[in-house]
């Protein structure tokens, strides 16, 4: 887990494939699908406040992945490690920015397609 959340991880647009082994569209290919739902901070831990909301962060998991409405938000990462600015958070694979809602209509405008990461252990 430590390597996964370190600079040594190998998550990028060549290795982050979908369930069929295909690369999702990155920022350069319409429709942009580079936002991956994670709900986590850069170190892989949950935001303080959790699915019940609260201080200092509101819910960042769309109600523990149960909401499909315009309300709420989830943290996403960029599988292609490419954001609109060069700041490290914008290029994070797991903690780049929140969605503007929890419905697909609110997830797609910022570059999402409702995708999640899945990992297999060796």
Regions found by a protein language model. Name each.
Residues 1-122:
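Secreted/extracellular ectodomain signature
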